[in-house]
Regions:
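Rossmann-like dinucleotide-binding domain that binds NAD(P)(H)
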Residues: 1-55, 59-61, 75, 150-153
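Generic domain-boundary/flexible-linker signal
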Residues: 27, 58, 71-73, 80, ...
Length: 172
């Protein structure tokens, strides 16, 4: 659900590609997911959730046309650009060279923003406690929930779509 948080900003979003796999699982649970979500005139959302890469520095990675979010159970980090902060640059038609006339690789500086945070605890202690705190304050004081039933329904709809597109054979 973490990567699907972007889904709520795009009311006409739909799953345009999905792939589930059980590469390193002896049972019948998915351990890999690749999901592309698109909406008219919005950035493409590329979600990859994997527990099969032995060298990955993240469990979830969401790539968009303006930035990337990566996360582990311990922390998350986002790197992104803001429209208007990076001016258009003219096309350079001749070969790029350094001061000595040697060819160089083209690059340009981008004004990027980086945010991140470490999580204290895990989904089963801190996450569950925060959910129950929110439920308590919703019932007793009417405070809004961070995740509404409508948001949960949208995430469940995407999950159901992805599972319908990728039926797993029953092993047991």
């Amino acid at each position: 659900g973490m990567g699907l948080g972007f889904f709520f900003f795009f009311p006409n979003a739909r799953v345009v590609y999905s792939k589930l796999d059980t590469a390193l699982t002896s049972g019948d649970a998915d351990d890999y997911a690749k999901i592309l979500i698109a909406a008219p005139n919005k950035p493409l959302i590329d979600i990859e959730i994997s527990s099969i890469d032995a060298y990955s520095s993240y469990n979830i990675k969401v790539q968009g046309t303006k930035g990337t979010l990566k996360a582990t159970p311990a922390a998350y980090e986002m790197t992104y650009i803001v429209d208007g902060e990076n001016p258009d640059r003219p096309v350079i038609e001749e070969s790029l060279k350094d001061e000595g006339g040697n060819p160089i690789y083209c690059w340009e500086p981008l004004n990027k923003h980086v945010e991140g945070e470490s999580f204290n605890g895990n989904a089963f202690d801190v996450g569950t406690a925060k959910l129950y705190d929110q439920l308590y304050y919703k019932i007793t004081e009417g405070r809004p929930m961070t995740v509404t039933p409508e948001m949960a329904a949208a995430v469940i709809s995407v999950i159901e779509t992805v599972h319908a597109q990728n039926p797993l054979p029953l092993k047991y």
